[in-house]
């Protein structure tokens, strides 16, 4: 539970400064920042429900999953063409130096967002139908969110999990991508 809360908090902190980063951003840099803010807001709005602080609302989870999925995958990667690392951007050069890993993370977010929608029928903290083997579900733990050597998350297995656990995986994907590919700004 503490690890889940720490992950959600860290993920929230990593994206909390995005709004301030819009100063001077134009064109595609501004477009991708707007997409990241939409994802940040989605995670922020769903966090109290996933922590049990507000009543569970399946429709809110479905809306959030759709928003995450809409900004992930190819939609996300299209917003990072080479040469779009101007001064207003928080994108690190590593995105273009290790495009395969960045692209894999964007695709993982899309998979996990789809699984979040599927898991919406599994309220937070509900029992899973059978034991979950994390090595097949998420490529061996942290590696799922990181490098390109991980196996892809199993969307069917994720969809069987309690929705709060799938939400945590989504937050971990965001956090891992930001850790590797987003520059820190003061």
Annotate the PLM regions.
Residues 22-53, 58, 62, 66, ...:
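Sequence context surrounding c-type heme c attachment/ligation sites in exported
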Residues 8-16:
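Bacterial N-terminal signal peptides
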Residues 1-9:
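Bacterial N-terminal signal peptides that target proteins for export
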Residues 2, 16-26:
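Extracytoplasmic entry segments of secretory-pathway proteins
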């Amino acid at each position: 539970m503490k690890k889940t809360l720490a992950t959600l908090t860290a993920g929230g902190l990593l994206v909390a400064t995005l709004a301030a980063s819009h100063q001077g951003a134009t064109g595609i840099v501004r477009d991708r920042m707007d997409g990241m803010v939409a994802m940040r807001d989605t995670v922020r709005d769903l966090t109290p429900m996933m922590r049990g602080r507000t009543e569970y609302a399946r429709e809110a989870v479905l809306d959030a999953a759709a928003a995450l999925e809409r900004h992930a995958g190819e939609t996300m990667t299209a917003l990072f063409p080479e040469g779009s690392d101007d001064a207003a951007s928080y994108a690190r050069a590593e995105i273009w130096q290790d495009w395969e890993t960045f692209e894999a993370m964007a695709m993982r977010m899309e998979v996990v967002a789809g699984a979040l929608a599927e898991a919406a029928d599994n309220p937070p903290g509900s029992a899973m139908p059978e034991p979950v083997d994390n090595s097949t579900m998420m490529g061996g733990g942290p590696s799922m969110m990181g490098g390109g050597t991980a196996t892809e998350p199993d969307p069917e297995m994720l969809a069987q999990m309690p929705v709060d656990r799938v939400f945590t995986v989504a937050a971990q994907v965001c956090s891992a991508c930001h850790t590797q590919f987003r520059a820190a700004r003061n």
